[in-house]
Amino acid sequence: MEHNHEFEGGHEHRHDHDHGPEHSKYEEALAKYNIRLCDEDVKAKTALLIEKHVAENNTPDVKKFLFHCIDLTTLKCTDSDESVMKFTGKVNEFVDKYPDLDNVAAICVYPNMAEVVNDTLEADHVNIACVSGGFPSSQTFTEVKVAETAMALHTGADEIDIVIPVGKFLSGDYEGMCDEIEELKAVCGEHHLKVILETGALGSASNIKKASILSMYSGADFIKTSTGTVSYTHL
């Protein structure tokens, strides 16, 4: 059964509900990797890596690099045109206050604030990132996610952050999850699509690895751990 939907801008939205052979391609992708992980082993290996490498990476150069990777974010219910303009102004002033440091990578805001940042941002080499797709829960219609993403890009966003549909993933609907990511990546085109796994809700290292593989398989340019709105797992 196939449904086609089209929204302003000509993007075609497709749902192909053939769960037999389609489902197998996702299982086939996962079968290429070891996804049966022991949580305690992962925890121990992670602790060992930190212990082994933290000292050598605790340097000014590494810290400068990490700072330059930051998406400076305001995602508050109290955000307004005025507050976001002021927030962006701090990024504009950064180069004068700290000439020896590279600026942040991006300013991240809700989609309706992309135009405000675009009109205010003067700093070089700082992108405009927008959360989209029913952030942070990802619980809305795919059509809404597509429209929201397209509007964010149209009004100035350089890159888009979405959250995987966690409910679909946990229920084994890999086709539904992957189709949605693929569709949003098609809207983004050459713009980066960053996919947030919401690891605190996934429950195990195996699930985190599966969600990572499926997200990248579906076109994610980056994967990220969490929105910060869900408690961490025990991992």
What does each model-identified segment do?
Residues 1-21:
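Histidine-centered metal-binding segments
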Residues 17-106:
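Alpha/beta catalytic barrel-like cores
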Residues 68-70, 105-109, 128-131, 160-162, ...:
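Hydrophobic faces of well-ordered beta-strands that scaffold small-molecule active sites
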Residues 72-81, 130-144, 170-171, 196-207:
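Active-site mouth loops of central-metabolism enzymes
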Residues 84, 143-151, 208-212:
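Short, acidic/polar
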Residues 102-155:
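Active-site cofactor/substrate anionic-group-binding motifs, chiefly glycine-
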Residues 159-212, 218:
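Conserved anion-binding
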Residues 233-234:
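Conserved small/polar residues in nucleotide/adenosyl-binding loops
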